[in-house]
Curated annotation (Swiss-Prot):
Pfam families: D_CNTX. One of its GO terms (molecular function) is sodium channel regulator activity. Belongs to the neurotoxin 03 (Tx2) family. 06 subfamily. This is Delta-ctenitoxin-Pn2c. The lineage of its organism: Eukaryota, Metazoa, Ecdysozoa, Arthropoda, Chelicerata. Residues 1-17 form the signal peptide. Reversible inhibitor of voltage-gated sodium channels (Nav). Delays the fast inactivation kinetics of neuronal-type sodium channels. In vivo, it induces rat penile erection. This effect may be due to the neuronal nitric oxide synthase (NOS1), since one of its selective inhibitor completely abolishes all the toxic effects of the toxin. This toxin also causes scratching, lacrimation, hypersalivation, sweating and agitation followed by spastic paralysis of the anterior and posterior extremities and death at dose levels of 0.24 mg/mouse. The presence of a 'disulfide through disulfide knot' structurally defines this protein as a knottin. It is found in: Secreted. It comes from Phoneutria nigriventer (Brazilian armed spider).
C-alpha cells in the first residue's frame, strides 16, 4: 500500500511539473513579444535606445530588454563571435 501511494505521489509530481513547464513556455513567448524592439521599427544601437533604460544589444541582433535580472528570449542566445 505504501509503495502504491509513493508511486502515485511521484506520478502526480511529474504531471504537475510538466504543466508548470508548459505555462513557463507560454509566458516566455508573450514576454519576448513585449521585450523586443521589433514593433518599434528601430534598429538596435549600441546603447539600445529602442529599449529605453532596460535594454542591451546582443550579438548585433535584436534589442532584448531586461526584465529584472533576466534576459527574456524565446531562443537561447548564441555566444558572440569576436
Amino acid at each position: 500500500m505504501k509503495v502504491a501511494i509513493l508511486f502515485l505521489s511521484i506520478l502526480v509530481l511529474a504531471v504537475a511539473s510538466e504543466s508548470i513547464e508548459e505555462s513557463r513556455d507560454d509566458f516566455a513567448v508573450e514576454e519576448l513579444g513585449r521585450a523586443t524592439c521589433a514593433g518599434q521599427d528601430q534598429t538596435c544601437k549600441v546603447t539600445c535606445d529602442c529599449c529605453g533604460e532596460r535594454g542591451e544589444c546582443v550579438c548585433g541582433g535584436p534589442c532584448i530588454c531586461r526584465q529584472g535580472n533576466f534576459l527574456i528570449a524565446w531562443y537561447k542566445l548564441a555566444s558572440c563571435k569576436k
